[in-house]
Amino acid sequence: MAKTRVQFICQNCGAVHSRWAGKCDSCGEWNTLIEEGTNSGIGSGPAAMLSKRKGRAVALTSLSGEIEDAPRIVSGISELDRVTGGGFVRGSALLIGGDPGIGKSTLLTQAAAALSNRGHRIVYVSGEEAVAQIRLRAQRLGVAASAVELAAETNVEDIIATISSDNSGSKRPDLVIIDSIQTLWTDMADSAPGTVTQVRSSAQAMIRYAKQTGAAVVLVGHVTKDGQIAGPRVVEHMVDGVLYFEGEGGHHYRILRTVKNRFGPTDEIGVFEMSDGGLREVSNPSELFLGERNEKSPGAAVFAGMEGTRPVLVEIQALVAPSSLGTPRRAVVGWDGGRLAMILAVLESHCGVRFGQHDVYLNVAGGYRISEPAADIAVAAALVSSMAGIALPPDCVYFGEISLSGAVRAVSHAVQRLKEAEKLGFRQAEVPNGSGELWKDRNFRLMETAALADLVARIAASGAGKK
């Protein structure tokens, strides 16, 4: 008879240890090892499994062929459909993560109602709330009349048996929402709910159901203090798409971001605004991020960025102030602090702008976060503008990457960035050298910049002209 062998599994990275330790050897986190049992001994190894079941041959098919069902389920919420690549793919599994209270359940409740209004069968299974609580949220959102089927259950076998039964004579579900994966448990694992083994086994069972039946499955995941989805990393590899629902506590907008998508582009974003009646779509996020600009204030530059296939204009704010400290302060919100240090070094080395006796504060307006290097030239322009006390032209946008030699390098999607700027009323742009060939015969002034020193000289000349 197989005996139970004790092992300790890290709840942060999933690493298996033979005995308990205060610190995980794989990820370095403290107090994350939890004792879990596993069957071992005679009759439990791979050889025993092979003796019980022999493999069967499966039919091989080609890439081309007929698709029985429509490939995607369109919700009608354009921002959600944009992020998923045009709708939920049948037979796919999506994982959505976000901070507590950010609006994950609100978003999925509205999506479930929108899909049910289009004639799809939607099943919403909650392991954290009672059915009455879900109904209260639906009433607050004004979608209580939608034909969404609800259940409060945490056992995976019971959930699959419920949505697979045809006692009611209804069709199979088109979309199944599980809120959340950390609350599920399966009879196939002996550990407690929320542990690595249970999360992995429960996710495997739900993904297997999606592939076998063709129903789309959405799994809600908790996040850790670092902003990563809690549980084993293997779950993110198993699912077809990973979405993060982001937002700052002091701002009313939310961003749904694609991190992984097997059926569409990654790095796409959908922007929503949180209101009393739920989440409202923001079709033009650039207007949201540029809503309250002070055009006469030095240290503000508008960056034309890209999020996936969507151009987004955001304001970068810089403040350079004299420092009384031996080591001046460098504070960054919404951008990479290491990249700011590089821009400051290039400005000092190649442009003669000295920041050694000044504190530098950099902020991306609206709580937005920028990760692409195309924002380098906008950051440099904001820093020089604040240092010199010269306001930048209010109808100008900036984009371009700065190298360590002080050269301005070209970036991708220049035309899309310029089109978005022109649509919002901007009339000029500081762009890398060579971008003018892509943008001709327009009532739009392009100032091509080959080196960062050229940009600094232009800003200084504009201030001298005003004096």
UniProtKB/Swiss-Prot annotation:
InterPro entries hit by this protein: AAA+_ATPase (IPR003593), DNA_repair_RadA (IPR004504), P-loop_NTPase (IPR027417), RecA_ATP-bd (IPR020588), Ribosomal_Su5_D2-typ_SF (IPR020568), Ribsml_uS5_D2-typ_fold_subgr (IPR014721), Rubredoxin_2 (IPR041166)
ZnF (C4-type) ranges: 10-27
One Gene Ontology biological process: recombinational repair
Annotated positions binding ATP: G98, D99, P100, G101, I102, G103, K104, S105
Molecular function via GO: ATP binding; ATP hydrolysis activity; ATP-dependent DNA damage sensor activity; damaged DNA binding; zinc ion binding
Transmembrane segments: none
Residue span of motif RadA KNRFG motif: 260-264
EC number assigned by the record: 3.6.4.-
Gene Ontology CC entries for this record: cytosol
Pfam families associated with the record: AAA_25, ChlI, Zn_ribbon_LapB
Record note on disruption phenotype: No alteration in UV resistance; does not replace RecA.
Keywords for this protein: ATP-binding, DNA damage, DNA repair, DNA-binding, Hydrolase, Metal-binding, Nucleotide-binding, Stress response, Zinc, Zinc-finger
Positions of the UniProt region annotated as Lon-protease-like: 359-467
Record's comment describing the protein's domains: Has a putative N-terminal zinc-finger, a middle region with homology to RecA with ATPase motifs including the RadA KNRFG motif, while the C-terminus is homologous to Lon protease.
Similarity-based family: Belongs to the RecA family. RadA subfamily.
Cross-referenced NCBIfam families: sms (TIGR00416)
Function per UniProt: DNA-dependent ATPase involved in processing of recombination intermediates, plays a role in repairing DNA breaks. Stimulates the branch migration of RecA-mediated strand transfer reactions, allowing the 3' invading strand to extend heteroduplex DNA faster. Binds ssDNA in the presence of ADP but not other nucleotides, has ATPase activity that is stimulated by ssDNA and various branched DNA structures, but inhibited by SSB. Does not have RecA's homology-searching function.
The name this protein goes by in its record: DNA repair protein RadA
Primary gene name: radA
